[in-house]
Amino acid sequence: MKIGITCYPTYGGSGVVATELGKALAERGHQVHFISYALPSRLDGFLGNIIYHEVEMSTYPLFEFPLYTPALASKMVEVAKFEKLDILHVHYAVPHAISAYLAKQIIGNKLKIITTLHGTDITLVGLEPSFLHMMKFIIEKSDGVTAVSRFLRDKTITNFQIEKEIEVIYNFINPEKYQRRENLELRKSIAPDNEKIVIHTSNFRTVKRVPDVIRIFNEIRKKIKAKLILIGDGPERSACEMLCRELGICADVKFLGKQSDIVPLLSVSDLFLIPSQSESFGLSALEAMACEIPVISSSVGGLPELQVHGETGYIAEIGDIDRMAKYSIELLTNLTKHTIFSEAARN
């Protein structure tokens, strides 16, 4: 098949899943065309049947805001016509599904549109009053719709009164890539005195509650020797660095920024924290679990569908720093329980 894929090309979960899906389809012999404003971050290496098409943006001074939606639709038309695409698979309804629908109307052929809902396009952006009618229309007009969790499917149906069937297809990872590979040298460089290593990865947006991660770690640190690794970057990083200085824990916290390969860092870590305000699935938690790391998470969105409280980690209410810290200390000080949870997380 000839498949077009549009996603946000960033380090977020939706872009990662879309890119890994495209690579896997290409390995199975399909021709895959990525259509976006930048090269997806995970699209590394060369595959002969993967082609990237960059969306060209107009800089005409009359327009106060970039016209990405029509520019994307125009590029979709171009690629679909000349590459004879069978399917356009768009990740995020806003604005990608809108552009795909416009492209299909322009082409007027049997091009199929599959829309995958990932979260904030439904739970935040889509609930803006000015978007409500458009969101319902574009979901109903897609030839197929998937959501990354039951939580997101149900919320979409309720919020927009959707009658169309939405299939739940959970996010995924390659278990052969995401598996624990012990690296004593790397671990010693991070924790020279054999401290426990706590890790968090995110885009440092408000919804991820990274300051909670730091406060939980501060409580852990009062009881046991530990180090915190923070992977990623975003608007709250500076505030988080300031919080570390205020708490006097900078020596034990490492801000590593964006990393192209996080498996080595996951492989030396003992605990993963994800205290998010909202999380439609939680791909970063799945990556950690595949590397045999117990997870401490908030009880939001799709996270309770991903991990089992008391088996693969623990779940607490949003903002309950004391309870998350208590659970963390329990796992980090009980080797037998930690081993059982680690094995369950992988399996």
Regions found by a protein language model. Name each.
Residues 309-310, 314-321, 330-336:
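Conserved acidic donor-binding segment of nucleotide-sugar-dependent glycosyltransferases
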Residues 151, 172:
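Carbohydrate-associated surface elements
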Residues 258, 277:
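Aromatic "clamp/platform" in nucleotide-sugar-dependent glycosyltransferases that forms part
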Residues 323, 330, 337-347:
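A short, well-ordered alpha-helix in the C-terminal region of glycosyltransferases
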Residues 294-297, 307:
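Short hydrophobic beta-strand element within catalytic cores of glycosyltransferases
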Residues 178-192:
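A short helix/loop element that forms part of the nucleotide-sugar donor recognition site in Leloir-type
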Residues 241-257:
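Nucleotide-activated donor-binding/catalytic signature segment of Leloir-type glycosyltransferases, i.e.
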Residues 192-208, 214-217:
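Conserved donor-binding/catalytic core segment of Leloir-type glycosyltransferases
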